[in-house]
Amino acid sequence: MASFTPEVIGYLGFFPITNTLLDTLFVDTLLVGGTFAVTKNLSLVPQKAQNAVEALLETFYDLTTSVAQNRAAKIFPYFMTFFLFILLANWSGLLPGVGTIGFFYHHGEEKEFTPLLRAATSDINTTLALAIISAIATHILSIQITGIKDYISRYLSLNPLNLFIGILEIISEITKVISLSFRLFGNIFAGEILLVTISGIFAFLFPLPFMLLEVIVGVVQALVFGMLTMAFMAIMTTPHHHKEGVEDPRTK
């Protein structure tokens, strides 16, 4: 049965190396390697593979533009980075050997199995880190685009009503981090438990429909995380005291 917490494979000094950390490094390697492979032989007259990648990126960029409008160019890289990393991290748990190749160790009289790799997003530490990075990037982008004065005015004001709203905004930012992290973790961890249970009871073809379901869940959860981050960034990069019908030059 999958453990709620990641298993420790070894230590680097006093720093524990978990199987989800190894999977994170594996996914990072795939992303970096894939980026080099895709961009290595770009041409003005694109071939089939380049055409497919460009069409996919254009679709996502149009989606970002529909949400963030003239801030799309700044928000799009964050959206795609989160989407691709989370997608590969979700799918990595379905690869042969992930969760099944490892070693046994004795815990008292019992023998327990520790997998060498485990889907990174099935670890609450990973999803919480992603949510915190998303929140920090959102606030940095907000300051860059709207300015520090406008940013502070969202949370601090001499007006008692606006000050109360600002406090609610701060609470809202905390709940965003919690909801982003637990939504992703809960769905992927539940899928991991489901696959382990089904595979333990049945063999061969019966688990395949559930694996297909997890492929779809992996896409949906990556898209949800990326789009929520995109929406939060679009909201935070809109000037707080934006006048209707007047475009703030700082958002260009």
Regions from the language model: what does each represent?
Residues 1-252:
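Selective transmembrane helix interface/packing segments
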